Regions:
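Short, charged/polar micro-motifs that form catalytic or ligand-binding hotspots
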Residues: 17, 48, 76-80, 132
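Conserved GTP-binding G-domain of TRAFAC-class P-loop NTPases and closely related GTPase folds
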Residues: 121-145
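Short amphipathic alpha-helical segments
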Residues: 25-28, 81-84, 116
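Conserved N-terminal substructure of TIR/SEFIR domains
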Residues: 1-71, 90-100, 105-107, 137-154
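Glycine-rich, charge-decorated loop segments at or immediately adjacent to ligand/cofactor-binding or catalytic sites
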Residues: 109-124
Length: 154
């Protein structure tokens, strides 16, 4: 039985570098309980149907999202599209309180001076996922943090 029967699931948008796709998939697996409980529905650009205009699809989804996850790595920071388009729009929506932006530190990189550097990051202590001895523990910590953010939105 869904824990959220009367509420619509909150749209979660993944902003990430395609070089981090495997880590995005691992995170998605750890969010399965939140999806089954109808607390969230997730979206990323690999879900764009053939023939759709990808920039419009991304713009629409980032503007609909209640939670925007920035999956941080050196590749994310090096991506002009992630940095200049997705992250910029995400932070605009965050500042207007239209969405919650959560940085997820996937791999070690110099992110602290970035525009999102003032936001509380996950996992615990902003320790990069790939540095945890057990990645499942890192992704569980992230999933719990996302659940708490979702509960605050309801």
């Amino acid at each position: 039985m869904p824990l959220n029967p009367s509420e619509q699931p909150i749209q979660v948008f993944f902003s990430y570098s395609h070089k981090d796709e495997a880590l995005r998939d691992e995170l998605s697996t750890h969010l399965a309980v939140l999806k089954r409980q109808r607390l969230i529905r997730e979206w990323h650009d690999r879900q764009i149907p053939a023939g759709d205009v990808w920039k419009e699809a991304i713009d629409d989804r980032i503007n609909e999202a209640g939670v925007i996850l920035l999956l941080i790595s050196a590749d994310f920071l090096a991506s002009d599209y992630c940095h200049e388009i997705e992250m910029k729009r995400a932070l605009e929506r965050h500042e207007k309180r239209e969405a919650v932006v959560i940085p997820i530190i996937l791999r070690p990189c110099n992110w602290q001076g970035s525009p999102f550097g003032k936001l509380q990051a996950l996992p615990k202590d902003a320790r990069p996922v790939t540095t945890w001895p057990n990645r499942d523990e890192a992704f569980t910590n992230i999933s719990e943090g996302i659940r708490r953010a979702i509960e605050r939105l309801q």
